[in-house]
A protein has these predicted regions:
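Short, surface-exposed polybasic/aromatic micro-patch for ligand or macromolecular engagement
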Residues: 1
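Short, basic (Lys/Arg/His-rich) helix/loop patches that form interaction surfaces
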Residues: 134-146, 155, 192, 206-220, ...
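Hydrophobic recognition helices of helix-based DNA-binding modules
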Residues: 47, 90-94, 202-205, 258
C-alpha cells in the first residue's frame, strides 16, 4: 500500500507539474515579466514536450541531455545552455520541496557546446543610423511593431522592457514612464523621461490599444505583449541582417554616439 501511494505521488509530481509551480512561485515573488516569459517559453517549447510527463524524481541525466541535444541540433547553443539552467532550477525546487533527491543537471557539466559570446550588433555611424530611422518610418507592418521600433532608439531601454510597457506606467502630466521596481529587480521604480517624439507616438497608439494593458500588444496573442520575434522580423523585413543591427543594439548605439 505504501509503495502504491509513493507511485501515485510520483505520477502526480511530473516535471511539468513542478515546473508550473515554480513559474507561479516566481510570479508571486515579483519576477520581471520578460524573465517569466523566457522561462515559460523554454519549458513549454523545449523541455516539457520531451521530459514534461516524467515524474520529476525519475528524470535521468540521459533523458535531460537528449532534450537538450534536440535544441543543439538546431544550432541553438545558447538556448540549450539556458534550458539546462532552467531545468536545474525546476529540479532544485523539486529537491527543496521533497519531491526529488537531487538535481541531475549537475551531471551534464561540460556536455553541451559552450555558446560563443557575441556582442549585440549595433549601428554606430550617424549617417547609417539616419538611414535606419528613415527605414523605420517607412515600415508598413502592424502599427504596434512600427511604434515599438520608433521608440526603441529614443528611450535607451532594453527591448524587453519596452515591449512590456503598460499604459498604467505612463505619467502624461510629468511626461515620464515609471517602470515598477519589481519589473527592474530594483528597490525603487525606474523613471524614464519621455521626449516629445515618444509622447506623440504614444498618443497615436492610445487610440489603438488604450483599452488593453500593454502599449504594444501582440496582434496574434490577445492580452499579451509584442513578442521579441516580431521586432526582430521587422528589422529583417527592412533589409537589416542580424549582423548589422538588433533591437538590443540600440543601447550600444546610444552609448557610442553620446560618448562622441
Amino acid at each position: 500500500k505504501q509503495h502504491k501511494l509513493a507511485k501515485q505521488v510520483a505520477i502526480e509530481n511530473t516535471f511539468e507539474v513542478v515546473a508550473a509551480e515554480l513559474v507561479a512561485k516566481r510570479r508571486q515573488e515579483g519576477a520581471a515579466p520578460v524573465t517569466l516569459d523566457k522561462m515559460k517559453w523554454i519549458l513549454d517549447k523545449k523541455l516539457c514536450p520531451y521530459i514534461g510527463r516524467i515524474p520529476v524524481a525519475e528524470v535521468t541525466p540521459r533523458q535531460l541531455l537528449e532534450a537538450l541535444r534536440r535544441i543543439e541540433s538546431d544550432g541553438l547553443h545558447e538556448t540549450a545552455n539556458r534550458a539546462k539552467r532552467v531545468a536545474g532550477q525546476v529540479l532544485r525546487y523539486a529537491v527543496a520541496t521533497g519531491r526529488a533527491d537531487r538535481d541531475v543537471s549537475h551531471d551534464l557539466k561540460g556536455a553541451l557546446v559552450v555558446a560563443k559570446v557575441t556582442h549585440r550588433a549595433a549601428i554606430t555611424d550617424p549617417q547609417e543610423l539616419g538611414k535606419l530611422l528613415v527605414a523605420i518610418e517607412g515600415y508598413n507592418g502592424t502599427p504596434e511593431v512600427k511604434a515599438a521600433l520608433q521608440v526603441t532608439p529614443l528611450l535607451f531601454q532594453r527591448p524587453g522592457e519596452i515591449r512590456h510597457m503598460e499604459w498604467a506606467e505612463i505619467d502624461w502630466e510629468l511626461e515620464r514612464w515609471e517602470i515598477p521596481a519589481h519589473k527592474m529587480k530594483m528597490k525603487q521604480p525606474h523613471i524614464v523621461p519621455l521626449c516629445r517624439q515618444v509622447l506623440e507616438i504614444l498618443k497615436d497608439m492610445e487610440s489603438l490599444t488604450r483599452g488593453g494593458r500593454y502599449v504594444f500588444p501582440s496582434a496574434r496573442r490577445g492580452g499579451r505583449p509584442l513578442s521579441e520575434n516580431g521586432v526582430r522580423t521587422a528589422l529583417r523585413t527592412l533589409g537589416y541582417s542580424n549582423e548589422q543591427v538588433t533591437s538590443h543594439g540600440f543601447r550600444a548605439t546610444a552609448r557610442t554616439l553620446l560618448d562622441e
